[in-house]
UniProtKB/Swiss-Prot annotation:
PROSITE patterns: FH2, GBD_FH3, WH2. This is Inverted formin-2. Residues 1206-1244, 1260-1284, 1294-1303 have a biased composition (Polar residues). Residues 446-470, 478-541 have a biased composition (Pro residues). GO terms for biological process: actin cytoskeleton organization. Residues 879-930, 956-991 form a coiled coil. Residues 343-352, 1345-1359 have a biased composition (Basic residues). It holds the Pfam family Drf_GBD. Residues 1009-1024 form the WH2 domain. Residues 341-391, 440-541, 1026-1049, 1188-1244, 1260-1380 are annotated as: Disordered. InterPro entries: ARM-like (IPR011989), ARM-type_fold (IPR016024), FH2_Formin (IPR015425), FH2_Formin_sf (IPR042201), FH3_dom (IPR010472), GBD/FH3_dom (IPR014768), GTPase-bd (IPR010473), WH2_dom (IPR003124). Residues 1328-1339 have a biased composition (Low complexity). Transmembrane segments: none annotated.
Length: 1380
């Protein structure tokens, strides 16, 4: 114990000296850090910094988040993640660092500002996808989750995710964009990671609303063997995996059904069915020739070729374009159609950076590394000057020089006569970048010469003169042409003049002799080390015309003696063959400067680097000056020769000759001799014993293979003659020859071996054929004698006649046995259920005995692998061999006859028994053919048994599938019940009030987490992606299905929701936004005098709710349409003027007529409490207004389930809303509901005010009738599938009654002023068409709706009751109403 205490004490002291290591304390330093400090800390990647940043991001507000993003915080995170992924995970610390970094990215994307910033800026998702290039499974899991959430978040996010996968495919040089997902799914054994991958697949598919796009994405995964992987994943029996698999299969089934409806019953995912339909479509027309040609061309495409996927993709694009052009190219010819198919609009930037072919090749020195199969454009991306380390001006000059050949045409002046091969004329090498830098260094004194020619150029043009030298300012020369392009033969490269200080290059030759006339000079000799190439030609003869002579070499360059002058009378340059002058750098050494002594012995070599002679010619060099002096020391050559000579090899004395043993004599060739010796060694006995075994007929040491090999090694005729003629010593013969001599001593040795072989073969064959024949015979009997098979076939016959009723295949009396294999091809409407599955379910319920059918076919399944035809052929062939041997034995020696006659007869008897069994099988085959109604001559037992075996396997598999499906259904039901229990527990708080979920979670800053939770639960059976989040999406336009014949909306409903009760102190104004500008165009200034008013909720997940307005006394203070008209005329002043204060009583909840409602219940669904909680506004709401709104939603009332909601004729739509009420009516909470309703409605009737009620409540209906108010036809039509709200908090209040409607707006601004009275209204009628137009316009503008600030959200959450009061269930989301 003392040692342990001492260790603990030392450890404590060490921790105190090292300082506090608690990460919580360190991370706490960033709790109040500003974005600048966080950016600086991010530049030092560490787990502590990332963890602290994660906490800071979770607690940050919108302003802080925006500033952090503007300071490139996200760029730093993604760059660090990319670098961490690129260097691998060699340590646990690296893996933890990666994980904390990706957690910061996820926290950033959890906020509305962060995910919108990523979606609106391309490149971030690509950078995120590069983090998949790591071995850290947890990091890849997080990346796939983020990509999946982006797919569901918005269409833009879905497109960016697909683009990121496409980018990753190009970076990793993969063949398909989804290969990374499928490779991970097929190789991983981590179940949570596999769940993430499968959910990512579902998110990619569900992320698009277009059916064809969904099918295309799903088929891409299916083409990568996803269906096979799903079968393996189901065997893991993980609940989350099963959810994702079920979601995938159900969505696939639904899409296939929808495709079947669209294409008239054609399975567009079945290649054979599509081809058959296409063939039947064009088979009787001339188009069949083109179809055949297209198919023949496609058949020639090799799918294993690397370019095959690109070709197929290009063909797919062309076909899609052809479909689009089908109705638009009637008057065009083939050429015009091809131009329209092939021509595509390209991005201007791509065309600008599309390089010329020659420029492409020249730029190789500054290319970045790309995969080999990438396009030409991608290979010409130049490196950044800062990262490459090359000065920017150097690269610019190099680029200008490299681009010169593309824009200047070379001068073509071909020479006549014979010219030596261009390979004999070397081109002066000069690297591009190095020359550019060298030219920059000397640009002040010498203009840069042209770059050298590229390899492969040919000679046909004299070089142009070099640029003028310093001091030749009066000479004006035109720019020389550029060097020839690669592959453009017939041009001589121009020689660039050497720059000062270029050590390895010879100066150009001096000017020609007087009278030469200035012929072009030859190019300078190449650099040293360019062996194998002849130097340039000598200068031309005097008197040759041409261009002016070149200038002399630069001063200080020295010079070597000029080349020898050419012979006079040589003729013109073009009439003779150019002869190259000798260059010392190519192996022709000049005369040595000093004498070298020759050693007498072979010496060891000194490994040095030899200078070329042309370098030493300079008089200023060390070697030239040293060689000219006489003081050079002389070495002691004799001592050097003794010390550094190679050792001399001493001649060995010839060894005494060894007597070789006498060579063996053999009459066999070497190969046969070797094979026979190998054969004899396996017996491991002397040759005499082997001969005795053969003579006695003992087969114990011989098997079939040995005997077959022995027959091949028997001596041939000439070998037998040679061995018999040998009369010398037998011991001199080889072992194989001696064995042959012993074998020749046995009479009829070959017949003996053949008899041994046939007996072995027959015995083995009969042992194999007897059980096979028995199995085949039993299989035939089992099929005929089975009583379950006919019953099963009768059941299938009845089902088939039912399915094929009315067609040419119906009313059948029987079917061929091969039909049993097609039961699985008929698929049910439900997923993974075929006709065979259903028939087995029927059997399990009503005919359980038929489930034992596979046991009747067990022998048939065994017989399926037997080749019966081979049995016949083997038996007949061996019988023939036995008869032949029997004839040979009858004429052989007596001992052979006595030895093998009995054995041969026994073999024949065994084969005859097998032959009898086969004959019996033939007879049973005829019976089986009659039993199955088949042709006995064409019936193949092998095919029949194979069909029955395949059917038996399908039977057992379908039986197992049914069992597994039932078990999975039980588990799913149990899981569903568990989730429902958890939902029920979470729905209510301590005081029984409803707690918000779903969209509220998104508002609280957990967008990614909410989306992933939705994905994990199976997307809540959603198939289409929602635009943005639930708060940002827009309602869909009203379809024609919900519109009546008279233009009014007619909707059948299933259930109703609770309408929030809001008591207004005064009229409620509608704040104008951009969305209402579009609405006011059709709806502004309308009167509703004696006409029914239709109030249609834009997005109600409840089916419908009704609201009645008295036709005679409906006088509302203002309508939303009037405010829309004012907004259209002057939106700015309208927003400032219009306001209202929403007030409620804290103790009681007032219903429509002002009476208190203690509690109202509704059986099916409830509306959300806060209508405007998810809608952002440019203007901040007042705190009192927020409180009033939260209180106003507590009132609830019961609504019945109406049958059909309709509208009356529109003849009374004038002056329905004329003036505002000036009074407010509030009843106390102690009055009963019935009394409050009767009194309120009676008072409202006497005062000729608008009476509004909600259908379905008997109290409301009776009170309304007693008050002599005509029933209204106002309808509140709910859209059960709508996602979003269009308007927010539009409340229409009368003196005694209140109409509340939620409207989605961007601005919720209210004050204490009342609504102005007696607004003038327009004359435009409001009908369903305008409503449809409004919804469509609102759908377009809905993308612009933004969320409210976090300040408002906090105020809403800090309401009086301390919790949210409404339910925002995924199936009941009420957002607002539109007055029609």
């Amino acid at each position: 114990m003392s040692l342990k205490e001492g260790a603990h004490t030392k450890w404590g002291v060490l921790k105190q000296k090292l300082g506090p290591q608690d990460p919580e304390q360190i991370e706490g330093n960033m709790e109040n850090a500003d974005p600048e400090l966080c950016i600086r800390l991010l530049q030092i990647p560490s787990v502590v910094n990332y963890s602290g940043l994660k906490k800071r991001l979770e607690s940050s507000d919108d302003d802080w988040m925006v500033q952090f993003l503007e300071l490139s915080g996200l760029d730093l995170l993604l760059e660090a993640l990319d670098r961490l992924s690129g260097r691998g995970v060699a340590r646990i610390a690296d893996a933890l660092l990666q994980l904390t970094c990706i957690n910061c990215v996820r926290t950033l994307m959890n906020s509305h500002r962060g995910i919108e910033y990523i979606v609106n800026n391309e490149g971030y998702v690509r950078k995120l996808s590069q983090a998949l290039d790591t071995s850290n499974v947890m990091v890849k899991k997080q990346v796939f989750e983020l990509l999946a959430a982006l797919c569901i978040y918005s269409p833009e996010g879905h497109a960016l995710s697909l683009d990121a996968l496409e980018h990753y495919k190009a970076v990793k040089n993969q063949q398909y964009r989804f290969s990374v997902i499928m490779n991970e799914l097929s190789t991983s054994d981590n179940v949570p990671y596999m769940v993430t991958l499968l959910s990512a697949i579902n998110a990619i598919i569900f992320g698009t609303e277009e059916l064809r796009k969904r099918v295309q994405l799903r088929n891409e995964f299916i083409g990568l063997q996803l269906l096979d992987l799903l079968t393996k994943l189901r065997d893991l029996e993980d609940e989350d995996l099963l959810i994702q698999a079920i979601v995938f299969e159900e969505a696939k089934s639904e899409d296939e059904e929808e495709l079947l409806k669209i294409y008239g019953g054609i399975d567009m995912n079945n290649h054979q069915e599509v081809f058959s339909t296409l063939f039947n479509k064009v088979s009787c027309s001339p188009l069949s020739v083109q179809l055949l040609s297209v198919l023949q061309g496609l058949l020639h495409l090799d799918q294993s070729h690397p370019s095959s996927p690109l070709l197929w993709e290009a063909l797919d694009i062309l076909v899609n374009r052809a479909v689009l052009l089908a109705d638009d190219c009637q008057n065009n010819n083939v050429e015009e159609v091809m131009d329209r198919l092939v021509t595509s609009k390209k991005h201007p930037s791509k065309e600008k950076r599309k390089p010329d072919k020659c420029t492409n090749q020249v730029n190789k020195s500054i290319q970045t590394d790309k995969p080999k199969d990438e396009s030409c454009e991608e290979k010409t991306v130049k490196k950044d000057p800062v990262s490459s380390g090359i000065p920017a001006d150097s690269l610019q000059l190099s680029d200008a020089l490299l681009a010169l050949p593309a824009c200047v045409s070379p001068l073509h002046t071909p020479l006549s006569g014979d010219i030596t091969s261009p390979s004999h004329f070397p081109s002066p090498p000069s690297p591009v970048v190095s020359n550019a830098i060298d030219r920059i260094s000397t640009s002040s004194s010498l203009p840069p010469p042209l770059p050298p020619p590229l390899p492969g150029t040919e000679l046909s043009l004299p070089p142009p003169p070099p640029p003028p030298l310093p001091g030749m300012g009066g000479i004006s020369l035109t720019p020389p042409p550029p060097p020839p392009l690669p592959g453009m033969g017939g041009m001589l490269p121009p020689p660039p003049p050497p720059l000062p200080g270029m050590g390895g290059m010879l100066p150009p030759p001096p000017p020609p002799l007087p009278g030469m006339g200035g012929m072009l000079p030859p190019p300078p000799p190449p650099l040293p080390g360019m062996g194998g190439m002849l130097p340039p030609p000598p200068p031309p003869l005097p008197g040759m015309g041409g261009m002016p002579p070149p200038p002399p070499p630069l001063p200080g360059m020295g010079g070597m003696p000029p080349p020898p002058p050419p012979m006079f009378g040589m003729g013109t340059f073009t009439d003779e063959v150019v002869v190259a002058r000798v260059d010392y750098s190519l192996g022709y050494l000049p005369k040595a400067y000093f004498k070298v002594n020759k050693p007498t012995l072979k010496m060891k070599k000194l490994n040095w680097q030899k200078l070329p002679p042309n370098v030493i010619n300079d008089t200023h060099s060390m070697w030239a000056s040293a060689s000219s002096s006489n003081d050079t020391p002389e070495p002691n050559y004799s001592s050097i020769e003794q010390l550094f000579c190679l050792p001399q090899a001493v001649a060995k004395e010839p060894a005494a000759p060894v007597k070789k043993p006498p060579k063996e004599i053999s009459f066999l060739d070497s190969k046969k001799n070797l094979n026979l010796n190998i054969f004899l060694k396996q017996f491991k006995c002397p040759n005499e014993e082997v001969i005795q075994l053969i003579e006695k007929g003992d087969r114990s040491r011989f098997d079939i293979e040995i005997l077959k090999q022995f027959l091949k090694l028997l001596p041939e005729k000439h070998e037998v003659e040679n061995l018999k003629s040998y009369q010398e010593d037998k011991a001199k013969l080889s072992n194989a020859d001696q064995f042959y001599l012993l074998l020749l001593g046995i009479p009829c040795y070959q017949l003996r071996i053949e008899c041994m072989l046939i007996c072995e073969e027959v015995n083995l064959m009969t042992d194999v054929l007897r059980p096979k024949a028995k199995v085949v015979s039993s299989a035939c009997d089992d099929i005929i004698s089975s009583h379950r098979l006919p019953l099963f076939c009768q059941l299938i016959l009845k089902v088939g006649n039912f399915l094929n009723y009315g067609s040419h295949t119906g009313n059948a009396n029987g079917f061929k046995i091969g039909t049993l294999l097609k039961l699985t091809e008929t698929k049910a409407n439900q997923n993974r259920i075929t006709l065979l599955h259903h028939i087995l379910e029927e059997i399990e319920q009503n005919h359980t005995d038929l489930l034992q059918l596979p046991s009747d076919l067990e022998n048939v399944s065994t017989a399926a692998g037997i080749n019966i035809e081979n049995m016949y052929s083997e038996t007949s062939g061996n019988l023939k061999k036995l008869r032949d041997l029997q004839n040979k034995i009858s004429t052989a020696a007596t001992d052979v006859k006595d030895q093998y006659e009995k054995s041969i007869q026994e073999c024949m008897d065994a084969l005859k028994e097998v032959e009898e069994q086969l004959t019996d099988i033939t007879q049973k085959k005829v019976k089986l053919a009659d039993y199955l109604c088949e042709d006995s001559a064409k019936l193949s037992l092998e095919e029949t048994f194979s069909t029955m075996k395949a059917f038996r396997d399908l039977f057992l598999k379908a039986k197992k599938d049914n069992k597994d499906r039932k078990e999975q259904a039980v588990k799913a039901e149990k899981r569903k019940k568990q989730l429902a229990d958890e939902e029920a527990k979470r729905q209510k708080g301590e005081n029984g009030k409803i707690i918000r979920k779903g969209a509220a979670k998104l508002e609280e800053g957990c967008i990614i987490d909410a989306l992933l939770a939705d994905i994990k639960k199976g997307f809540q059976l959603r198939k289409t992606a929602k635009t943005k989040t639930e708060a940002d999406s827009c309602p869909k336009p009203v379809s024609s299905e919900t519109t009546g014949t008279d233009g009014t909306d007619v909707k059948h409903v299933d259930h109703v929701g609770i309408l929030p009760q809001i008591k207004l102190d005064s009229s409620l104004n509608l704040d104008g936004t951009e969305q209402h500008k579009s609405k006011s165009k059709d709806n502004c200034g309308e009167n509703f005098d004696n006409k029914p008013v239709v109030i249609a909720p834009i997005n109600l997940d409840t089916s419908a709710c009704l609201m009645n307005i008295s036709e005679q006394n409906a006088k509302l203070p203002v309508s939303a349409l009037q405010e829309g008209a004012n907004l259209k005329q002057n939106p700015d002043t309208f927003v400032k003027e219009q306001s209202a204060i929403v007030t409620t009583e804290s103790s009681t909840h007032n219903n429509i007529d002002g009476s208190s409602v203690d509690k109202c219940t509704l059986g099916q669904s409830q509306w959300p409490s806060e209508i405007s909680d998810e809608v952002d506004s440019k203007y901040h709401e007042m705190p009192m207004q927020v409180e009033h709104k939260e209180r106003a939603v507590e009132g609830k009332c019961s609504l019945p389930k109406p049958s059909v909601l309709g509208t009356e004729s529109s003849s009374n739509q004038n002056n329905a809303l004329n003036e505002g009420s000036q009074q407010h009516h509030n009843n106390t909470a102690n009055e009963s509901l019935q009394q409050a309703q009767n009194s309120a409605l009676s008072e409202a009737s006497q005062q000729s005010c608008c009476h509004t009620g909600i259908k379905g409540s008997p109290q409301f209906q009776s009170s309304a009738l007693n008050a002599d108010s005509q029933p209204s036809h106002t309808s509140v039509v709910g859209s059960a599938q709508a996602q979003r709200n269009e308007l927010d908090d539009v409340a229409l209040q009368t003196r005694d009654t209140t109409v509340t409607e939620g409207s989605q707006v961007e601005e919720d601004k209210c004050n204490d002023e009342g609504y102005p009275e007696h607004k003038t209204m327009g004359e435009h009628p409001l009908n369903s068409s305008s409503h449809s137009t409004t919804l469509q316009q609102s759908s377009e503008d809905g993308q612009k709706v933004k969320r409210g600030s976090s300040k408002h959200k906090k105020k809403r959450r800090s309401s009086k009751h301390g919790e949210e009061d409404g339910v925002d269930s995924p199936t009941h989301k009420t957002r607002g109403c539109v007055v029609q």
